[in-house]
Design a protein with these regions (language model features):
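Conserved donor-binding/catalytic core segment of Leloir-type glycosyltransferases
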Residues: 354, 521-538, 544-551, 559-560
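Short hydrophobic beta-strand element within catalytic cores of glycosyltransferases
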Residues: 635-645
Length: 713
């Protein structure tokens, strides 16, 4: 027989209750009623209703003064539960029940709590859903009831009323109790609260407050996406542009902070842009800049583009930034201001004054600085912007840069950049800025006068916000390290496709490769090498799969990993990848199949024992490690970098035919084919070394830089 337990906090319409009990009986069910309302005055009516059991639950909270204070401060639903929770009869009946019914909205929380101890029971709100459930149980015979509470939620009006009453002025500790981890772990509790934050008629202030408590509870319960959904749902009911943008920002950051790419990211960016447009139209440039700053930060967050094995920019770059440039603020930001006078030609009666600058990353400048530092036609100075606090501060001041542009170059930031940077511009004939990040945006804030501005963009920058706040009309020459990077950036930044675009060049990174060509021992034939594993984009798991396929047929193959490890502190997404990688790696290191060489300043020596050099990355500019390995005489095997595969320019157009493969299976096949004999392996390595030295060695690349800076060979 089906057992129904009805819980009521307020006196029901007794005639309706009696009719319902008769219907339950006709369906073969027993019906028990437990109420916190005063049963004694209506005892005759309850007896006439022929209930199978009636229980008067405590009408007030019993216990310590602290518990009574908590009850007094709690929402009505929780207060009912605190009254009833200690009743043994109620708990016993709840464990036996097939259907648990909340007769009114105040009893919903109590029924939900009881259902946590009887997972097989239906937990419902209202008599009609309960009758349907009992009828379904009868029709199914002995079949187990189906869990669910689609009909259990109170009406929107009831929820709105309760939320207004409960949230207004409620202490934070009480709200946190109502949205605590046990509640939010349940689909029922989570759905109940999501319904509450979207209920109609709730004032914006209360809706925002409630949604944040709900999100906090869901996140604590491990429902990260649920927390994001709750905040986004509340945002959809808020009319204020600033509040809506703030809630959607919080929503997507819940997921980003956990290494996830948010589903609501386009909506969050659009909300910030709408808020920015509104403030910009009203002349509120500081607030417009703040909102635009958040839009750019979210749109180009590293968790979305850098710490993943894919990116929206790798799929449809133009479509991804189209909504961004449809906004008023981005059109204002992207308007080219140009320079008042063209840059002066290189001097003829004295050496060229060349200022080479970067901010903390001079990794690719050593050969340039060494060569031009000794060049008779060049007077060289080097400026590391990160070495001076004042220059560091203005170089990465993203929001201030935006505000200055939106305000028409009329802020104190403009004055500060003029004061700090103008002396360097006045001295230099040519400025060469490495990395198109914050300093490029800062430098193009002011007119460069007649100084020539040259900026180099590697690969990383394409996936950041910085090209979108740089005024390329004030840059004379833009240097890319590879054609596929040039193509991607041009598709992202409208200024690079307009009449004010700078001249573009493709010049390889400066590498001294001749010293890598050293003899290799015969046993290196079976040693694979991967140089650089410190980023998710390097995807060393791909290299592990290549090794697995090779060792399946010949266990002489080994893998050496050269370079520092990824940092789990970079982001949650990086940590997740690192955990997967370490799990795969541990048994291979233990067995000797993989050797971790760690970071080294002498890559050339490490390469003497490596016979095959891998590029397993999902994206690269020009993979220096692969080029160094090829120069050493190792067999090059490069993955067709997925971010660029199939495009007019990619790894296949950067490297000679045959070097690039699509899958680990193709990589393993290429390695087997060229390492089958020592003669074949050495022949392939010699050909690779010859190509590397004639195409990428510094004496070759140096001529391109001399032409760039001096107009000579």
């Amino acid at each position: 027989m089906t057992v129904v337990l009805i819980v009521a906090a307020t006196r029901p319409q007794l005639a309706v209750l009696a009719d319902s009990v008769r219907t339950f009986h006709e369906l073969g069910a027993q019906v028990h009623l437990a109420g916190t309302f005063h049963l004694a005055p209506v005892s005759k009516e309850l007896t006439a209703a022929e209930l199978d059991g009636v229980r008067q639950l405590p009408r007030s909270v019993r216990g310590s003064s602290a518990l009574r204070r908590k009850a007094a401060e709690s929402p009505t639903g929780m207060r009912v539960w605190l009254q009833a929770t200690g009743d043994n009869w109620l708990r016993a009946q709840a464990r036996k029940a097939d259907v648990l019914v909340a007769l009114d909205s105040k009893a919903v929380y109590t029924v939900w709590r009881l259902a946590q101890h009887n997972r097989g029971a239906e937990a419902l709100y209202g008599i009609t859903p309960a009758l349907r459930a009992v009828e379904a149980l009868r029709d199914r015979g002995d079949a187990a009831p189906r869990r669910g509470m689609r009909d259990s939620l109170p009406s929107a009006a009831v929820v709105a009323r309760d939320v207004r009453r409960s949230v207004s002025g409620l202490p934070a500790v009480v709200m946190r109790t109502a949205t605590a981890r046990p509640v939010m772990r349940s689909a029922v509790g989570a759905r109940l609260w999501r319904g509450a934050v979207t209920a109609p008629g709730v004032p914006a202030r209360l809706r925002v407050s409630a949604s944040r408590y709900v999100a906090e509870g869901m996140e604590s319960a491990g429902r990260t996406s649920g927390a994001a959904i709750a905040l986004a749902a509340a945002a959809s009911k808020v009319g204020d542009l600033g509040i809506r943008a703030s809630l959607l920002d919080e929503s997507v950051m819940k997921e980003i902070s956990n290494g996830l790419v948010p589903g609501k990211l386009p909506q969050a960016v659009a909300a910030q842009l709408a808020h920015a447009d509104d403030r910009f139209t009203r002349g509120d440039f500081p607030e417009a800049a703040t909102a635009l700053n958040r839009a750019l930060t979210l749109n180009f967050h590293r968790v979305v583009h850098i710490d993943q094995l894919s990116s929206p920019l790798a799929r449809k770059a133009g479509a991804y930034v189209e909504p961004l440039y449809a906004s008023k603020v981005m059109r204002a930001l992207g308007a080219p201001r140009g320079r008042r006078t063209p840059h002066a030609p290189a001097p003829t009666g004295r050496p060229l004054r060349l200022l080479v600058t970067t901010s903390g990353n001079a990794n690719f400048l050593h050969h340039i600085l060494s060569h031009f530092g000794d060049h008779p036609g060049v007077e060289l100075r080097f400026l590391d912007l990160a070495a001076q606090k004042s220059l560091m501060r203005i170089s990465w001041a993203g929001r201030r840069i935006l505000e200055d542009r939106l305000a028409g170059d009329a802020t104190d930031y403009q004055e500060e950049v003029e004061r700090l940077i103008r002396p360097y511009l006045d001295w230099a004939d040519t400025v060469f800025l490495d990395w198109a990040v914050g300093p490029a945006s800062m430098l193009t804030t002011i007119d460069p006068g007649d100084t020539r501005i040259v900026v180099r963009l590697h690969s990383y920058e394409a996936f950041t916000r910085w090209p979108h706040s740089t005024d390329f009309s004030r840059i004379d020459d833009l240097v890319f390290v590879a054609p596929h990077v040039r193509d991607l950036v041009a598709s992202l930044v409208p200024q690079l496709r307009g009449e004010h675009a700078p001249r573009t060049h493709v010049i390889d990174n400066a590498m001294e490769l001749a010293g890598f060509a050293r003899p290799k021992p015969a046993e290196a034939r079976f040693r694979l090498g991967l140089i650089g594993i410190g980023q998710v984009a390097k995807d060393p798991l791909w290299a592990i799969e290549v090794l697995r396929l090779l060792r399946k047929e010949d266990d002489r193959y080994r893998l050496s990993l050269v370079g520092g490890d990824m940092s789990a502190k970079t982001s949650h997404a990086t940590r997740d990848y690192l955990q997967r990688f370490e799990k795969k790696l541990a048994p291979l290191v233990k067995s000797g199949a993989v050797e971790r060489l760690g970071a080294t300043d002498d890559v050339a020596s490490a390469l003497t024992g490596i016979g095959t050099i891998l590029s397993s990355s999902v994206r690269e500019g020009c993979h220096v490690g692969l080029m160094e390995g090829a120069a050493s005489g190792a067999l090059p095997v490069a993955r067709d970098w997925p971010f660029y595969a199939g495009r007019p320019n990619s790894a296949r157009t950067l490297y000679p035919e045959g070097w690039v493969v699509e899958t680990p299976e193709e990589a393993a096949e290429r390695i087997r084919r060229h390492t089958g004999t020592e003669e074949a392996w050495r022949k392939a390595g010699a050909a690779a070394s010859a190509h590397a030295l004639t195409a990428w060695d510094w004496p070759v690349v140096r001529t391109h830089f001399e032409r760039l800076f001096l107009g000579t060979e």
